[in-house]
Amino acid sequence: MVHLTTALDASSGVPLYEQLYRSLAGEMRSGTLAAGTRMPGKRRLAAELSVSVNTVDAAYQMLAAEGYLESRERSGFYVQEYLALPSRPAGGPEQPAPPKPEPPVLPVRYDLSTRGVDPELFPFRTWARLQKELLYSSPELLTHGDAQGDPALRQALAEYLSEYRGVQCGPHQIVVGAGLEYLLGLLAPLLPGPAAVETPGYPRALQVLQNNGVHCCCLPVDEDGLSVEALNRSDAAVCYVTPSHQFPTGVTMPAGRRAELLHWAARRPGGRYIIEDDYDSEFRFDTRPLPSLQGMAGADGPVVYLSTCSRSLAPSIRIAYMVLPEHLLPVWRKKYRLYSGTVSRFEQQTLARFITEGYFTRHLARERVAYKARRDALAAALNTAFAPGELTLAGLHTGLNLLAKLKDPPPDAALRCAAEAEGVQLSLLSDYDLTGEAPSAAGTLVLGYGSLKDEACASVGETLKKVCMAAREASVTV
């Protein structure tokens, strides 16, 4: 005779069959219902519990599906052997100390971070209309797409890059992926090593390369970009550069330095490569942009071109793309032929139409006007708040950030604390020193204005002046 301790509560909100299933499973795990025990018939148990036969049947079927019960023809249900979880040692493991409470997060009054963009500039209505039209007209969006990227998007990108960035490629050379870091991580195993990166530079690129086992050396940046002289002295076989807008200094690599870089790669054909991250190339305010390094090298040159839509559209639109030299395509396809695409076809086809129907270039023109006005307002506010000679601005002509180098600066740690206290979110040039050995970077603010509100530009200069004064006072009293 099986004695069950099951108690069901019709008012609990949990279905009765679910309650019965949980109760019986618990008794089987605890050993109260031993292996081999024959369970009561469904009608009998239903009568004992005052529930319907369907309720008992549903619970039994769930228990059988999960291996607690075995159904034997014309015999009923029997409890299966259950391997209990190993018991914990007496006293259990030593409990970790309770986490310390997090310090309160102060509200951000001025967002001067370098990765921000202005969501108010996003073309919501156009983007939504294109997506709606695609939903009604493109049932293939629900099927598997090309792992290298949707053909329509790759065609649109090839035409756009040729016209506006001088990139020489066909659609078959373009790979679309969910973010620059993702593509860089796939590219790294295809190239020789070691690799050279810029310092100050992009910490994420360095981390991705190192995570893929690439030995990296950090080479200095001067007023023309990465030092090719230092590159020649290194043993690097790959060079990662941001020539259109060196991040975070804002330096643009001139044509002469670009030619030197290409000559460096050409001295060892097939053994040296340049990874060109065309970061913020869309945002050049005062002069025409130089053509890409890839365009100078040609479709089968030593340059791999990388770019992303995270700045021109929105960070949440995870569409980045890479242009591979012709001779690397067979290597790529062999290594990644079984990989799936990482960007939805829906977003890819939306972007393809956004480009081919002319919306993208108009959107960029609108952004350039808005960001240029914001840059001018920020620079004017800084020049008004600080006395002549107290502050030197640099990196104004490209990208969405500028540098503000302080004369006789307080320690960077004091600047960080003072900025946080005033609700200012910013970076310091030393944050991007990838060697930790560049004292000249101290006292230089990296001020992004992509997320800065237009109405905040007038007062941000005085607030930063206040931050510097507070940092100096704090460093004197320490």
Map each language-model feature to its residues:
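N-terminal basic, amphipathic alpha-helical segments
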Residues: M1-K132, P139-L142, H327, R333, ...
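Active-site PLP attachment segment
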Residues: R74, M296-W332
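Residue-level marker for buried hydrophobic side chains located in beta-strands
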Residues: L112, I274-I275
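Short glycine-rich anion-binding loops that position phosphate/pyrophosphate groups of nucleotides
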Residues: V117, S244-Q246, R311, L452
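Conserved core of the PLP fold type I
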Residues: Q131, E140-G271, E282, D286-D300, ...
